[in-house]
Amino acid sequence: MVTYQTQPVVFQLAGYSNSGKTTLMTKLISALNSDGKMVATLKHHGHGGKPDLLQNKDSSQHLNAGAIASLVEGEGRILLQAERQSWSIQEQIQILAQLQPDFILIEGHKQEDFPKAVLVRRHEDLELLSNLKNIVVVFYWDMEIIKNDSLLGKNAFHIDDPVGLIWIKEFLYQMKNTNK
């Protein structure tokens, strides 16, 4: 039996450190989950170097011995650790797509060309609005920072405005319906 699986919708949250990406991401994940949607996330490790391994675990020892990947499963949870020179964003998305989520949400990877929300906390963050591609919505912390900026348009919300989260959900559902 062949089943047809649509590709997941990919959406980004971009902004500098401490701009509220993780907080907005967790709210969006919870909102989509409450609608019965499956979400996978991809996070850029923006602190330089490799993310930490799970220390003192057999799987980490396997990697340290030279395995290119180690997958641990228990009661339906999988932890995958893999080593190689680098992973393109497309390869990371392909890995997550195997889990058949409705949505793949990316935190970071600012320069990628997926539809994105940009978070502006400080005046210096405004340069993101002219330097990034495919911005569909902006979240700001202080109206004074963005009030004279002509790049914002109508899809701009205060970081605490629940209408912004609703706007993203509706945008994602439109993309999902277009993807069918």
Describe the residue ranges of each PLM region.
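Glycine-rich phosphate-binding loop used to anchor ATP phosphates in small-molecule kinases
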Residues: 79-120
